[in-house]
Curated annotation (Swiss-Prot):
Keywords: Amidation, Antibiotic, Antimicrobial, Cytolysis, Fungicide, Hemolysis, Secreted, Signal. InterPro entries: Antimicrobial12. Residues 52-69 have a biased composition (Low complexity). This is Moronecidin. GO terms for biological process: defense response to bacterium; defense response to fungus; killing of cells of another organism. It comes from the Eukaryota. Coiled coil: none annotated. Residues 1-22 form the signal peptide. It comes from Morone saxatilis (Striped bass). Expressed in mast cells in gill, skin and gut, and in lining blood vessels in the viscera. Also in intestine, spleen, anterior kidney, and blood cells.
Amino acid sequence: MKCATLFLVLSMVVLMAEPGDAFFHHIFRGIVHVGKTIHRLVTGGKAEQDQQDQQYQQEQQEQQAQQYQRFNRERAAFD
């Protein structure tokens, strides 16, 4: 009976502490962080990948345009 009373008293002390001091706060914050990360991976990851692909394609087009201009200048200088 003494153990049960001690357990209940200590539980009350922990629960009456400020939420920032409680261990449960850290667990809750971790769960929220994991949830946000999963959500970002599922929804935002696709958009980020599409944006990176579009940027890569644009860079490739710019490189091809520069090479084409360089080739035309060299050809004009040779003729």
